[in-house]
């Protein structure tokens, strides 16, 4: 699949990446709308600000990273243990990392 990824200040690239699978406790969303917000612009012009350069302890993500965190779409796959949404549900995403414990 194609994705816009941040590699560094003023260095974003459209790249072919592997399409993700719905892992345990997660869902896969087919994006139907994605906005570019102020934080995306700040990352482009002056980052990294929030983009993890080292592996993030909760997400496992690190740069280069796919941009665009304000999006909506519909669920196309659910991972093991997911019970609150099902395939076909329309969703919006709250892009906040949390441990889920506290």
Task: Give the role of each language-model region.
Residues 1-4:
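Short structural boundary motif marking the start of a folded domain
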Residues 6, 44, 76-79:
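Short beta-strand-to-turn element immediately C-terminal to the catalytic PLP-Schiff-base lysine
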Residues 7, 42, 69:
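Histidine-centered active-site/metal-ligand motif
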Residues 8-10, 23:
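Residue-level recognition of beta-strand termini and adjacent short loop/turns
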Residues 11-17:
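Short glycine/threonine/proline-enriched tight-turn/helix- or strand-capping micro-motif at secondary-structure
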Residues 20-34, 49-101:
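Glycine-rich beta-strand-centered segment in the early N-terminal region that forms part
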Residues 38:
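Helix-loop element at the rim of GNAT/NAT acetyltransferase active sites that forms part
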Residues 42-50:
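Short Gly/aromatic-enriched secondary-structure transition segments
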């Amino acid at each position: 699949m194609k994705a816009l990824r941040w590699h560094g200040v003023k260095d974003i690239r459209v790249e072919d990446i592997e399409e993700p699978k719905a892992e345990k406790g997660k869902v896969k969303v087919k994006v139907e709308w994605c906005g570019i917000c102020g934080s995306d612009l700040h990352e482009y012009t002056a980052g990294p600000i929030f983009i993890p350069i080292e592996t993030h302890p909760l997400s496992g993500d690190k740069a280069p990273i796919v941009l665009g965190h304000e999006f909506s779409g519909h669920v196309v796959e659910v991972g093991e243990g997911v019970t609150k949404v099902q395939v076909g549900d329309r969703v919006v995403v709250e892009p906040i990392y949390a441990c889920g414990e506290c």
